[in-house]
């Protein structure tokens, strides 16, 4: 049975109920679940003060569980980046720990990649996903398969026009606002020739465009093999838009960057999300409108898992839509 620790490294958990529900569901999925002692701490909008949250991260790293799953994102990891013991986290990855999350966890994933090249996992958050009332089938199934080493690829549908695309590169990215906040810091991994995956929430398309243009003008976008856009959810239209939306943002970006920009990736602040490795060489193939994103089993998982036989679950996500 794979050990799994739930910890809260950023925003405060307002209620304990979602944490209990998440622990129950994850146990049913077959994980040996433990909850970090400080998971429900409160300090202002954070899950405890900076020292407490930093120690929680280090405590999880020293425990070296099979899975380190954050309860939620919010805001708070940026405060800790200059103080995290990156080599301690990297040693936990080497020992087999899969660090999983998205949203504010992008800071941890980017920092770990920048400082140590250790891979992590883009995936659900315990309370936001496993702790909500209604849980879809794709999210837990994909997560469980990824955490046990059975998952080697995911699939989704994109727009027409990319048939025949076949490229390889380091899978990286995350929350767009978080990425922009890390540009120019020591916690920015200088990835060239990568597959850059992006998502965000509650950002109007003009703000999304401004952040994408920042990455473009910093030379980040043009140096990638492909850009894969997940969900940009929960934004409100303005009467000033006059037809301006996310589609026009993508069209404008495509006019500037000679790199394939794919949409439709099932990830971000949405109910259904896949789990994929971060900081691992990926293989992106498009057939018609079907996108298959695979990765090297040996590099995505620790040496403890190399004896397991991986399966190709391409199409895992889009068959459910």
Regions inferred by a protein language model and the residue ranges of each:
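Short, acidic/small-residue loops that bind anionic groups at enzyme active sites
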Residues: 86-111, 119-125, 260
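Conserved anion/nucleotide-ligand pocket segment
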Residues: 117-180, 184
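N-terminal glycine-rich "phosphate-gripper" loop used for MgATP/nucleotide binding
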Residues: 67-83, 102
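ATP/NTP phosphate-donor binding region
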Residues: 1-64
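Internal helical hairpin/lid segments
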Residues: 190-246
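ATP/nucleoside-binding phosphotransfer catalytic cores, i.e., glycine-rich phosphate-binding loops
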Residues: 231-301
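Histidine-centered metal-binding segments
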Residues: 299-321
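Short glycine-rich anion-binding loops that position phosphate/pyrophosphate groups of nucleotides
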Residues: 72-75, 203, 233, 267
């Amino acid at each position: 049975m794979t050990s799994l620790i739930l910890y809260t490294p950023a925003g405060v958990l307002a209620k304990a109920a979602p944490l209990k529900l998440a622990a129950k569901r994850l146990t049913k999925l077959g994980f040996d679940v433990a909850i970090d002692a400080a998971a429900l701490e409160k300090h202002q909008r954070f899950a405890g003060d900076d020292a407490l949250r930093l120690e929680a991260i280090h405590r999880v790293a020293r425990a070296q569980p099979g899975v380190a799953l954050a309860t939620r994102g919010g805001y708070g990891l940026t405060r800790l980046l200059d103080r995290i013991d990156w080599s301690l986290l990297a040693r936990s990855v080497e020992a087999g720990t899969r660090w999983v999350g998205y949203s504010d966890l992008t800071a941890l994933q980017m920092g770990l990649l920048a400082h140590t090249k250790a891979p992590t996992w883009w995936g659900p958050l315990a309370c936001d996903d496993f702790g909500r009332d209604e849980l879809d089938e794709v999210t837990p199934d994909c997560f469980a398969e990824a955490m046990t080493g059975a998952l080697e690829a995911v699939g989704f549908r994109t727009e027409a026009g990319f048939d025949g695309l076949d490229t390889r590169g380091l899978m990286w990215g995350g929350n767009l606002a978080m990425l922009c906040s890390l540009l120019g810091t020591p916690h920015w991994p200088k990835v060239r020739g990568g597959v850059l995956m992006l998502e965000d929430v509650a950002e109007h398309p003009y703000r999304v465009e401004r952040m994408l243009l920042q990455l473009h003008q910093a030379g980040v976008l043009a140096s990638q093999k492909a850009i894969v856009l997940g969900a940009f959810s929960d934004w409100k239209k303005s009467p000033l838009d006059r037809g301006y939306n996310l589609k026009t943002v993508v069209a404008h970006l495509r006019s500037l960057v000679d790199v394939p920009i794919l949409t439709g990736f099932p990830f971000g602040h949405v109910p259904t999300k896949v789990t994929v490795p971060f900081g691992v060489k990926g293989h992106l193939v498009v057939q018609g409108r079907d996108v298959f994103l695979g990765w090297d089993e040996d590099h995505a998982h620790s040496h403890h898992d190399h004896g397991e036989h991986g399966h190709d679950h391409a199409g895992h996500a889009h068959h459910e839509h």
